[in-house]
């Protein structure tokens, strides 16, 4: 799977004649698309230059006009368009670690992903965020993000989350 690979085009999509399943979404109005947040943010405008890459590597740009906020009608191989960020903590209270064995595998995935927090309401601890990701959250106005704090004392927070970096996250 390649990042941002189109799996389906809605029949009413403004790209229905230009995009095909298997194409990759490269950029919108010159902004590289790396995941679902870029896609939703940059596709909001009514006038778009959409760059697509065919499976053979050739690229072409399609200029479209659509209603402000109107959907492009593209589905991708995965919802986030890349892998979810997994949790690096070892929390003493982790509910996933307390689940019984034998349940479906997706229930055991520990995410700590700002995108899933914003889009799905999941909680995150902020211990996974790089400075670049924090800046991106600010630049794209990604809000709200649900933060699981548990403690503000750095030493106690590091202990509870089982992660020495957790104490520095709230600085």
Residue ranges of predicted features:
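Post-signal-peptide, soluble extracytosolic/periplasmic N-terminal scaffold domains
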Residues: 14, 21, 50-52
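Conserved PDZ fold ligand-binding element
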Residues: 16-34
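Conserved Radical SAM active-site core
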Residues: 59, 66-171
């Amino acid at each position: 799977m390649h990042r941002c690979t189109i799996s389906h085009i809605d029949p009413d999509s403004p790209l229905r004649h230009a995009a095909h399943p298997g194409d990759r979404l490269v950029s919108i109005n010159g902004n590289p698309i790396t995941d679902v947040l870029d896609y939703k943010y940059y596709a909001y405008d009514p006038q778009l230059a959409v760059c697509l890459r065919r499976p053979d590597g050739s690229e072409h740009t399609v200029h479209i006009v659509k209603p402000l906020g109107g959907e492009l009608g593209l589905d991708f191989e995965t919802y986030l368009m890349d892998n979810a960020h997994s949790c690096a903590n070892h929390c003493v209270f982790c509910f996933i670690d307390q689940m019984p064995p034998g349940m479906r595998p997706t229930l055991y995935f520990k995410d700590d992903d700002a995108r899933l927090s914003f889009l799905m309401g999941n909680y995150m601890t902020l211990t996974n965020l790089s400075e670049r990701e924090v800046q991106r959250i600010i630049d794209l106005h990604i809000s709200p993000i649900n933060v699981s704090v548990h403690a503000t004392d750095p030493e106690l927070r590091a202990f509870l989350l089982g992660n020495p970096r957790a104490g520095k996250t709230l600085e």
